[in-house]
Amino acid sequence: MITSAHIDDIRTQVRAWRAKGETVAFVPTMGNLHQGHITLVKEAASKCDHVVASIFVNPMQFGQNEDLDAYPRTLAADSEALTAAGAELLFTPTPAVMYPKGLEQQTYVEVPGISNVLCGASRPGHFRGVATIVCKLFNIVQPDVALFGNKDYQQLLVIKTMVEDLSLPIEIIGVDTIREDSGLAMSSRNGYLTAAEKAAAPALKQAIDAMAAGIKQGESFEQVTEQAKASLIAAGFTPDYLEIRHAHTLEQAQNQHQALVILTAAYIGKARLIDNLRFDS
């Protein structure tokens, strides 16, 4: 696998592939990779002739009092895992490469509406940071296809909306959440959990599963939400949000809506975990 921190190197290699009529898939990451990321890379390899990955801990998407400095950097292990999964080109830029004028002077991309609810309400500016860096990476790599995990459901919708609104010629593919045997969604932030917290953490998935089951049995949105919040608190979580939304727009769900998604974020110990469940009522 070729690794470079330089934009020109990435463009030169992609251009060489394009000259042969070959296709390119892209998997952007922040590193500290787990099996969910590796699944994205393997899926990417099945879609296109070549796979490009990136590792960049993006300062623009971290808010005040968030874990930018604490975010684990594991480049050697990540490189090995990416190579084994089929990536051929790895972009590892520094903040100076991506934001040469600094964050204050950087042009940014903001997707209105869906960026400001749920995680966007809890983490102001987060999705502006996500949209900006992903747009920049898309312009550098210029892939045919880009893959993202469905675990970050709101992020996936933000990126799909940005691509559609800006007429970017890229197919965005969401890939199913990879879970541990307990049901806990794989996440780099699971590393912050103590053994006791990790044992309690599957309650997050259990709560949203119970909500969906209740809705399908005719229980009200309010009823299933209150029951789920109580179960999370009993398990040791502090819920940030737990909401039922329209699956395509993230508008507040109405009884007549068929396509629904339950989204939650909750704190346990030092970790803020997210999960979701997409279903039809």
Curated annotation (Swiss-Prot):
Compartments where found: Cytoplasm
Main localization of the protein described in the UniProt heading: cytoplasm
Keyword flag Ribonucleoprotein: no
Pathway(s) per entry: Cofactor biosynthesis; (R)-pantothenate biosynthesis; (R)-pantothenate from (R)-pantoate and beta-alanine: step 1/1
SUPFAM superfamilies for this protein: Nucleotidylyl transferase
GO biological process: pantothenate biosynthetic process
Residues reported to bind beta-alanine: Q61
Catalysed reactions listed for this entry: (R)-pantoate + beta-alanine + ATP = (R)-pantothenate + AMP + diphosphate + H(+)
Keyword annotations: ATP-binding, Cytoplasm, Ligase, Nucleotide-binding, Pantothenate biosynthesis
Function: Catalyzes the condensation of pantoate with beta-alanine in an ATP-dependent reaction via a pantoyl-adenylate intermediate.
Name of the protein described by the UniProt record: Pantothenate synthetase
